Amino acid sequence: MTSAPAPRELIALGCRILAFRGLAADILGHISLRRDDGALYLRCRGPHERGLLLTEPSDVHPVPLDGEPAPPDGYRVPNELPIHREILRARPDVAAVVHVHPPHVVAADLAGLPLRPIVGAYDIPAMRMALDGIPVYPRAVLVTRADLGQEVAEALADRPVAILRGHGIVATGDSVQQAVVRALSVESLAMMTLRSAAGPALPPPLPPEDIAELPDLGGGFNDTLVWNSHVAALEHAGLGL
């Protein structure tokens, strides 16, 4: 029986999946996971940085929720560490935080196209997030300070995902797998939004009777099976750990 991946392996796989699927270019993006001791595991940048697509478990290091981080020699924490710290501080229900730069999400928001529930069975989790509303943090800044991280956490509020205008997204979850899959779903919805906007009129949101027919397939399907399929795709492409 295959053992479950360790936290560092999960974060490394998540980074590889996000880069492989086009949500993270070169070195831009990171994932954190809350530790039992209150600190967090975080994808750091190393002395031989090769980008998110080739993230190794050795690129992941513990970082305190407060105070000065002290990664091993040659490693440094991302400039946007405050994103992770402030969301995890504000949201005790969140275990994992993803920050990436999905191009279709950024483009749709800049074009004034809100992510509405226009798809149904095509991607039910994306529809649910859009139905509840995906908030937007309106500043296109590098989130390098605690006060900016707090602004992002306030914009996110109790939602699973938020758009950072002209920048990217934050996606949260009760696991690395859930946060990564949510990020992928939002990018998929943004891609469909942009493509459908090329028609003569924007598609309407789903009618209530259709929404009522769409079940919650549960985390075993929405998160675990989808995650496993992306891990298998990495392995097939020779990019597995």
State what each model feature region is.
Residues 1-241:
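Glycine-rich flexible loops
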